[in-house]
Amino acid sequence: GFVALLKKLPLILKHLH
C-alpha cells in the first residue's frame, strides 16, 4: 500500500546517497 511505500522511501534515499 501507500504507507508501505512511505516507509521504503528513507531506504531508497539512503541508496541514492
From Swiss-Prot:
The organism's taxonomic lineage, starting at the top: Eukaryota, Metazoa, Ecdysozoa, Arthropoda, Hexapoda
Residue numbers carrying Histidine amide: H17
Tissue expression per record: Expressed by the venom gland.
Keyword field contains Magnesium: no
One CC-aspect GO term: membrane
Protein name (Swiss-Prot/TrEMBL): Antimicrobial peptide Xac-1
Location(s), subcellular: Secreted; Target cell membrane
Keyword Transcription regulation recorded: no
Keywords: Amidation, Antibiotic, Antimicrobial, Fungicide, Membrane, Secreted, Target cell membrane, Target membrane
Major localization listed first in the record, in broad terms: secreted
Role according to the record: Antimicrobial and mast cell degranulating peptide which probably acts by forming pores in membranes. Active against both Gram-negative and Gram-positive bacterial strains as well as against yeasts. Has leishmanicidal activity (IC(50)=25uM). Has little hemolytic activity. In the context of inflammation and cancer tests, is weakly cytotoxic to normal cells, induces calcium signaling but does not impact cAMP production. In addition, prevents LPS-induced nitric oxid (NO) synthesis but does not affect the IP3 signaling and pro-inflammatory activation of endothelial cells.
A biological-process GO annotation: killing of cells of another organism
Family recorded in the similarity comment: Belongs to the xylopin-like family.
